Amino acid sequence: MSLLTEVETPTRNGWECSCSDSSDPLVIAASIIGILHFILWILDRLFFKCIYRRLKYGLKRGPSTEGVPKSMREEYRQEQQNAVDVDDGHFVNIELE
């Protein structure tokens, strides 16, 4: 007699889910949390660029201009704007064959 014949295999009834029609509050809460988690994950994947860009750059402010004369504020703003502006002549056209 081999060991395989001695091992009990569960019947089909043993594998059934006991929580499929359960009204247990813990099961209901877990289901709701799982569904909400899935919805939030989908939204995160769809809008992650907007969300993380807002968190990274949207909450930061520039340096304080308190006590700085208005002319210096305007000069600083102009320097920052010039640093952001891009000259169109610096673009390179690459053509693929």
UniProtKB/Swiss-Prot annotation:
Pfam families: Flu_M2 (PF00599). Residues 60-80 are annotated as: Disordered. The M2 protein from most influenza A strains is inhibited by amantadine and rimantadine, resulting in viral uncoating incapacity. Emergence of amantadine-resistant variants is usually rapid. One of its GO terms (cellular component) is membrane. A lipid is attached at C50 (S-palmitoyl cysteine). GO terms for molecular function: monoatomic ion channel activity; proton transmembrane transporter activity. The record marks W41 as: Seems to be involved in pH gating. The keyword Transmembrane applies. It is found in: Virion membrane; Host apical cell membrane. Keywords: Disulfide bond, Host cell membrane, Host membrane, Host-virus interaction, Hydrogen ion transport, Inhibition of host autophagy by virus, Ion channel, Ion transport, Lipoprotein, Membrane, Palmitate, Phosphoprotein, Signal-anchor, Transmembrane, Transmembrane helix, Transport, Viral ion channel, Virion. The record marks H37 as: Essential for channel activity, possibly by being protonated during channel activation, and by forming the channel gate and the selective filter. Residues 44-97 are intravirion. The modification Phosphoserine is found at S64. The chain crosses the membrane at residues 23-43. GO terms for biological process: protein complex oligomerization; symbiont genome entry into host cell via pore formation in plasma membrane; symbiont-mediated suppression of host autophagy. It comes from the Viruses. The keyword Electron transport does not apply. Residues 1-22 are virion surface. It is a single-pass type III membrane protein. InterPro entries: Flu_M2 (IPR002089). Belongs to the influenza viruses matrix protein M2 family. Forms a proton-selective ion channel that is necessary for the efficient release of the viral genome during virus entry. After attaching to the cell surface, the virion enters the cell by endocytosis. Acidification of the endosome triggers M2 ion channel activity. Cytoplasmic tail plays an important role in virion assembly and morphogenesis. Homotetramer; composed of two disulfide-linked dimers held together by non-covalent interactions. May interact with matrix protein 1. When the channel is activated, one or more imidazole moieties of His-37 probably become bi-protonated. This is Matrix protein 2.
